[in-house]
Regions:
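Short glycine-aspartate micro-motif
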Residues: 1-3, 350, 404
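Structured, active/binding-site neighborhoods that engage oxygen-rich ligands
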Residues: 1-318
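Short glycine-/acidic-enriched loop or helix-start segments at secondary-structure transitions
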Residues: 15, 360-362, 415-417
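Short, cationic motifs built from Arg/Lys/His that form the positively charged side of catalytic pockets
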Residues: 124-125, 413-414, 441
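Short Gly/Pro-enriched loop/turn and capping motifs at secondary-structure junctions
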Residues: 254, 266, 410-413, 423
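Cysteine-based protein phosphatase catalytic domain of the PTP/DSP
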Residues: 319-402, 420-454
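A phosphate-binding catalytic loop at a beta-strand-loop-alpha-helix junction
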Residues: 400-419
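Charged phosphate-binding loop/patch that engages nucleotide di/tri-phosphates or the phosphate backbone
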Residues: 446-471
Length: 471
């Protein structure tokens, strides 16, 4: 869900324009400042603000949470409440949601639009179904995807596209195998009444050799092309970043194609595979039936997904006594704990390694890194999270900023990232970084063996590769 929201916000400024504009604007990754979250577009989105795609996905998630599953009246209530204040609503969805009652609304919209309701709005919001579907059987998850699509889109292709993507998301979360999940979805749907739609209407755009740059196809406002392009973007790349950029660079309905691709790529690469400069600034507002306007930021979207999985919100550890930030390296790198870091000047760069709630919203130069002080699979892409943290420190330093690195207590995660940065900056191995941290930071703790192992092995090899041999 976070992957979909991030991709949606990145694609929004380029919506309904020609292809290639993202890469023309950003020929290289922008690791400093607020990254590539520029905002703008036809609806003047704020930098990092997600669009109707994610707003509707969160409305759908809230409806699933309230009802414990699909309940058409509850979902209709959430959709119509969202629509009452939304500044961008797709044509098909807008027509359908004019009706106070869900029954017959999609068919009426279909007739009003001359039978053209095979649009991508049924799929742009599908990420919560893939997540919630982990708790359901495969058949139940597919049925849920079809039911939510049918509320607003009468054309069966809109339901099939939504169900196909939801099934891929669900399968990828469960197995970690994206390509295997795609093939499994083809095999599963072939045995259902929806199979002929994939085999006929979607066949060309879902083919393994589909190339959106060299084939004629319908606009990507249609469900067929949007799903095909999003699948292509993930299938032909090897990172979340590259998948989303590939989707946006196709032009047209960039936010929606990116949102669909981001949902699948997020399932594949996980929260730690999403560039932190993107996840830090994503935000938006959804009007809800019971709580009015609700502001969502990255952790709020993660919590929504957690609740759909039955996990509840991420636990918040009680705050500790603030520890005054300390300069630990003359390059301008500081260390602190959560509430100590919250007291640094607003022109500091802040690299946060824990849940911060609203403490740093007034700090324009910040990075929120998803990292858990745990062994096992709680950090499935720890190398990437460390690499992103180190790059953020260096980017802020290059801008002439002082940088504070912190976690909740300022102990294990803070030291892990600072040691990784020191190894990279000084071109040394972990034992020297360990000694530096021992001599420099009184709160240093070494209780997470996973952190030690990464610095000793994979990160050490990385430093040797980029420095020509660590000292």
């Amino acid at each position: 869900m976070l992957g979909s929201a991030v991709a949606d916000a990145l694609g929004a400024p380029f919506e309904f324009q020609s292809g290639g504009l993202y890469s023309a604007r950003f020929p290289r990754p922008v690791v400093g400042g607020i990254g590539e979250m520029i905002g703008g577009g036809g609806f003047n989105w704020a930098p990092g603000e997600f669009t109707d795609d994610t707003q509707m996905a969160l409305a759908l998630a809230n409806a699933l949470e309230e009802a414990g599953g699909f309940h058409p009246e509850v979902m209709w209530k959430h959709f119509r409440t969202w629509r009452s204040t939304a500044k961008d609503v797709g044509i098909t969805i807008s027509h359908a949601l004019q009706s106070p009652n869900y029954f017959g609304a999609a068919e009426a919209a279909h007739e009003a639009l001359g039978g053209r309701t095979a649009s991508n709005g049924s799929v742009m919001r599908i990420a919560p179904v893939g997540v919630f579907g982990v708790r359901l059987s495969r058949a139940e998850a597919v049925e849920l995807a079809v039911e939510q699509a049918s509320l607003t889109h009468h054309d069966p292709s809109a339901s099939v596209g939504a169900a196909f993507v939801a099934d891929i998301i669900r399968g990828t979360i469960l197995t970690g195998d994206f390509l295997g999940s795609v093939q499994s979805s083809f095999d599963f749907f072939a045995e259902t009444p929806w199979g002929p739609y994939l085999e006929n209407d979607f066949a060309s755009v879902l083919a393994a050799d589909f190339d959106p740059h060299h084939e004629s196809h319908l606009p990507n406002g249609t469900v067929w092309t949007a799903v095909g392009q999003a699948l292509w973007a993930v299938r032909t790349t090897t990172s979340f970043h590259d998948a989303v950029v590939a989707a946006i660079d196709l032009g047209g309905d960039t936010d929606t194609v990116a949102a669909i691709a981001g949902a699948m790529a997020g399932a594949l690469y996980g929260v730690q595979g999403i560039p932190v400069r993107w996840a830090t600034y994503v935000h938006g507002t959804v009007t809800t039936p019971h709580a009015g306007d609700v502001v969502y930021r990255g952790q709020d979207i993660i919590n929504s997904a957690r609740r759909l999985l039955g996990l509840g919100n991420a636990p918040i550890t009680p705050p500790e006594r603030p520890v005054q930030a300390k300069l630990v390296h003359p390059a301008g790198v500081w260390a602190s704990n959560l509430d100590g870091a919250a007291a640094v000047p607003e022109d500091f760069g802040v690299v946060s390694l824990c849940i911060t709630e609203d403490r740093f919203l007034n700090h324009p130069h910040r990075r929120q890194v998803y990292m858990r002080d745990s062994e096992g699979d709680r950090n499935p892409n720890l190398f990437f999270a460390l690499k992103e943290s180190v790059e953020a420190i260096n980017a802020f330093l290059a801008e002439g900023r002082q940088v504070v690195v912190h976690c909740h207590g300022g102990r294990s995660r803070t030291a892990f990232v600072l040691k990784g940065w020191f190894m990279h900056h000084e071109g040394v191995l972990h034992d020297q970084a360990h000694q530096w941290m021992t001599d420099t930071w009184d709160l240093y703790e070494t209780w997470t063996q996973t952190f030690f192992d990464l610095l000793d092995n994979e990160w050490g090899d990385h430093v040797e590769d980029i420095t020509g041999g660590a000292q």
